[in-house]
Amino acid sequence: MDLKDFTENEQEEIEKGLSKSISKQSVAIWYALTALLATYIVGQVILWFFPDGSSMGDSLLFILMNLIPMIVAACFSIVLGETKSLGEFFKKVFFQKESNLSWILAFFIPVIYYGISILLMNVRFTGNSLLAFFLYFPWTFLYGGLEEVGWRWFIQEHLSFSKHFISKMMVLSLVWFLWHIPIYQLPWITAGSSNYLIFYLMILGNTFLFGALKEYSKGAVPCILAHMLIDSLAVLMLVQSSLTQIIFLVIFPFMVSALFFKK
């Protein structure tokens, strides 16, 4: 069967759908390449000029690395005409009226992440006080939270196979993993695991969790909050790098996603 088998109107609708899909796919590809390249360049600048990680310059550049997904998303959104100005961009990202479910999920996702890890006995408690959590929490807005604007709010919405949730999350997890590599090449950064397979699996699990949350959110704030909570709770308890337990940790969000997002 080809386009000749359809009526003229049906052919036009199919062509429009294909054009829109290709357009979204191109945007997603160019966004990913731009964000990855920009992060790599900034990372190399840090390694060349601030290798010891003890100056104000490397701190500012490290913050910039974490902001690149949001900055690139803002540039793409405005250039493509999806938002008319920076003000409208921030309004769509931060000032949407979210459902009660999205807020509940934002707090429940860290419970899932650490709760399953505790049940699997794959957590090491650091011994830090609860005060350390509250002191670190604001910093995670810059060191992780705002990257959700790029990954969930922008690129997740632009992947061409938008109705195929699992496929979309698999692709997004690869991009997110590649983006982290220049960051974890910095000598003073401690990654979740020095084993890239385990590190990717941890990213894969969080991709499904945050991705599912975005399906119920309009803006990026619920995803930002969930990301900040997971990062901040690491001050109190660290998920360990046991491959078997990490696989089980990933299986749960994958199965839930397969149940609720069947395509």
Question: PLM features: residue spans?
Answer:
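N-terminal, membrane-interfacial amphipathic/helix-forming hydrophobic leader that caps
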Residues: 1-88, 115, 208, 212-214, ...
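Alpha-helical transmembrane segments of integral membrane proteins
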Residues: 26-35, 57, 61-68, 101-105, ...
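Short acidic/polar alpha-helix capping motifs at helix-coil junctions
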Residues: 35-36, 119-124, 135, 173-178
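C-terminal TM-helix exit segments that contain a strictly Trp-centered aromatic cap at the helix terminus
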Residues: 42-43, 117, 179, 183
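Juxtamembrane helix-loop-helix connectors linking adjacent transmembrane helices
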Residues: 53-60, 83-152, 156-162, 188-195, ...
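Transmembrane helix-loop-helix hairpins at the membrane interface
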Residues: 134-263
